[in-house]
């Protein structure tokens, strides 16, 4: 069993109006905090389209059917990776 909570995301540079969070009853929790966020493309568990910063466009993923939910983990900390310059 899974509880779905929809919250309004902060639309400063993301371009998203709403963000879906997933809380699994079996102990797995996906939340938005820190530098990364977890969200589901569609409520049917079959994915969908979502533009998140530089992740624009539709990104479909399999695994539809049953009680399997596919969660997309988006890392907002892109660009702050360890880079060594000259």
Swiss-Prot record:
Family: Belongs to the UPF0512 family.
Protein name: UPF0512 protein V
Organism: Dictyostelium discoideum (Social amoeba)
